[in-house]
């Protein structure tokens, strides 16, 4: 890596740490959403740096849909135990009782009930007035126009036409009772920045990001990993292929990519050559045109 790249990463690091500290100082009850992916790993690492040698003055929270990869849950529990942090795990029990799932109800219904409604339940239950998320502007077009401090009304809705100006590094965190802010410290990072920072800082990540022989089936041009017995195969026979994941979510809704990149330098080299978005493997993004923006308007992160 060049000195210029290191300087660029350090500038991003400083900006993110400033945002995290600003929120901790300004809000009464913040929380950090921990989705266990690479962006969450970087955001958590930055939070640990921001308050070192102390611990972050806010809990982590994972909205568990019940369909995450098994390796993700194992990694989550190991990291929280290792760092000695408070973790809140919330699940939409109404959705569980109704048997809501991606195979039985489809990706849109599953995402709305188990993720969006589950998140809103948790924010209301604990009274959080600010929630950190690991979204980046380069990921998807609706996220590209979102502010670092993203205002949400009392129903947790986002109005893209009613956003506050953000001049330089000045953020407006004023909220009334019941309103909240979603905060995105990684807004100005790219996928390549994330991977180079993970390499530079030796940040632990879920092994699913590295290429390995895994059982997959191909559906509508997408490779889906068979992670447990709940996946209906309909006569399909899983193939063992060398795949990895560029993004992680519920396993039935997350496509793998064929890859031989089994180390961080190999992943970085792959990122330098790729021309496709990391979210091409997220099936929820393909529900309909503009589906991510519509989800965010209803409270999705």
Curated annotation (Swiss-Prot):
Start and end residues of each stretch annotated as Disordered: 279-301
InterPro entries: PAPS_reduct_dom, Rossmann-like_a/b/a_fold, SO4_adenylTrfase_ssu, Sulfate_adenylyltrnsfr_sub2
Pathway: Sulfur metabolism; hydrogen sulfide biosynthesis; sulfite from sulfate: step 1/3
Superkingdom assignment: Bacteria
GO MF entries: ATP binding; sulfate adenylyltransferase (ATP) activity
EC number(s) on file: 2.7.7.4
Record flagged with keyword Repressor: no
Keyword Nucleotidyltransferase among UniProt keywords: yes
GO biological-process terms attached to the record: hydrogen sulfide biosynthetic process; sulfate assimilation
Keywords: ATP-binding, Nucleotide-binding, Nucleotidyltransferase, Transferase
Function field: With CysN forms the ATP sulfurylase (ATPS) that catalyzes the adenylation of sulfate producing adenosine 5'-phosphosulfate (APS) and diphosphate, the first enzymatic step in sulfur assimilation pathway. APS synthesis involves the formation of a high-energy phosphoric-sulfuric acid anhydride bond driven by GTP hydrolysis by CysN coupled to ATP hydrolysis by CysD.
Family: Belongs to the PAPS reductase family. CysD subfamily.
Record-given protein name: Sulfate adenylyltransferase subunit 2
Species this chain originates from: Marinomonas sp. (strain MWYL1)
Lineage: Bacteria, Pseudomonadati, Pseudomonadota, Gammaproteobacteria, Oceanospirillales
Gene responsible for this protein: cysD
């Amino acid at each position: 890596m060049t000195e210029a790249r290191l300087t660029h990463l350090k500038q991003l690091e400083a900006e993110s740490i400033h945002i995290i500290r600003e929120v901790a100082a300004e809000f009464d009850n913040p929380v950090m959403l921990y989705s266990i992916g690479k962006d969450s790993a970087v955001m958590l690492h930055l939070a640990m740096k921001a308050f070192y040698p102390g611990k972050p003055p806010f809990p982590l929270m994972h909205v568990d849909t019940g369909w995450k990869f098994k390796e993700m849950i194992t990694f989550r529990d190991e990291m929280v135990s290792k760092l000695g942090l408070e973790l809140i795990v919330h699940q939409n029990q109404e959705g569980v009782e109704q048997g809501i799932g991606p195979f039985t109800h489809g990706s849109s219904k599953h995402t709305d009930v188990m993720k969006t409604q589950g998140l809103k339940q948790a924010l209301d239950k604990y009274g959080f007035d600010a929630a950190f998320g690991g979204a980046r502007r380069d990921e998807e077009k609706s996220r590209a126009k979102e502010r670092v401090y993203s205002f949400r009304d009392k129903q947790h809705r986002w109005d893209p036409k009613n956003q506050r100006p953000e001049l330089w590094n000045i953020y407006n965190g004023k909220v009334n009772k019941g309103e909240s802010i979603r905060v995105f410290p990684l807004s100005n990072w790219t996928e390549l920045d994330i991977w180079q920072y993970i390499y530079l800082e030796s940040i632990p990540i879920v092994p699913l990001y590295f290429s390995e022989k895994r059982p997959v089936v191909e559906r509508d041009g997408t490779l889906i990993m068979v992670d447990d017995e709940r996946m209906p195969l309909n006569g399909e026979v899983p193939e063992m292929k060398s795949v990895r994941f560029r993004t992680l979510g519920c396993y039935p809704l997350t496509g793998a990519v064929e890859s031989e990149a089994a180390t961080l330098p190999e992943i970085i080299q792959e990122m330098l050559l790729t021309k496709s978005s990391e979210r091409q493997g997220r099936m929820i993004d393909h529900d309909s045109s503009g589906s991510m923006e519509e989800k965010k308007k209803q409270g999705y992160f």
